[in-house]
Every structure is written in structure tokens, then in C-alpha cells.
């Protein structure tokens, strides 16, 4: 016998798959390493929590999704948030956000994906994921990430590093090896491999 909450979750999952957000075969947003998963989710939570009250409100979640180009209906977001918070809270605490993330992983990628937990790492898939991430930053498709392109993405994500071009240029120069002021895919891969260490 299913509860009203289970019915609401099923209804929300169906509305997601009917809307703009579709299940994808890409695993770019599946975080495989459990320890990195929690760290990354915490960083995302902190970015979404604009007023730093340790809660993500419906409005904050809506703004974050819009900045990422994922236009979602406000009433659907409100329904989703209500499914994952305790009645006395006005928004998602970090623990609620983790639960929401797990449920969205189940909707989009299936709950039986072993590689979601890092059990079946696939180097070819990792390479594909890195290329996909690189392409997000390489807005003009020239095969390089310029300081301006990096700044645009950081600003869209609401990260403070994107506010000053000097800071962005320093980030680029710390990664690029041939001193041309931009990052190619191989430099990007090296950077990501030094940042993401298997647990």
C-alpha cells in the first residue's frame, strides 16, 4: 500500500520526464566516488543557498536551475521540495538536498547503476565525461577554453571566482602549460585528474 508521499514522488518523476529535463545516457552528473559525491554536493548546496541560511528555498532552487538553463515550473519545484523537507522547515537542508539528489539519480539513471557508487569505473566513459565537461566551457567550439569562456560559465554558476577577469586569468595560467593564455583538452584533463583523486 503506497503512501500519498510515494504517489507524489511518482507523479513528480513523471512530470520531470515529460518536461524539459529528460533522462540521459550521459553520466556526467552522476558522482561516482561517495566521498567526492558528498563534497561536490555540499559545494553545489552552498552555491544554491544564496542567502546562506543553510536552507535552499523554492526560489533559490528555481533561480539556480534557471541560471543553468533548466527552466522548470515553479509549482513542480515547490512540489519536489515539499517531498524532501520536514514539515517544520521552509527549505531543503543539506541532508534533504542529498536525498533529492539520490532520487533524481534514480529517475534519470536508474537505481541499479553500479557505477553510480564507483564500483565499475570505465576509463572510456571517464574520457567521454571529461570531453563533455570541456565542451560546456568551450562555448565557441574552437577546442580551447579562454579566460572569457571560463568567466562566463563561472558567472552562470554564481561562483565568486567569475566576478573578476584577473582571477579567471590566474586560474587559466595555473593550468595551461604552453603559455598561450588558454586551456586545451589535454591540459583540462590533467587539471581534472589532479583535482579529482579516487577515494
UniProtKB/Swiss-Prot annotation:
Location of the EF-hand domain: 36-71, 75-110, 125-160, 163-198
Key words, A-Z: Calcium, Metal-binding, Repeat
InterPro entries: EF-hand-dom_pair, EF_Hand_1_Ca_BS, EF_hand_dom, EF_hand_pair_protein_CML-like
Positions of region (Disordered): 1-31
UniProt GO MF annotations: calcium ion binding
Binding site for Ca(2+): 49, 51, 53, 60, 138, 140, 142, 149, 178, 180, 182, 187
Skewed-composition ranges (Basic and acidic residues): 1-13
Keyword Zinc: no
UniProt entry tagged with the keyword Transmembrane: no
Organism superkingdom: Eukaryota
Function: Not known. Probably binds 3 calcium ions.
Name under which the protein is recorded: Calcium-binding protein CAST
Source organism: Solanum tuberosum (Potato)
Organism placement in taxonomy: Eukaryota, Viridiplantae, Streptophyta, Embryophyta, Tracheophyta
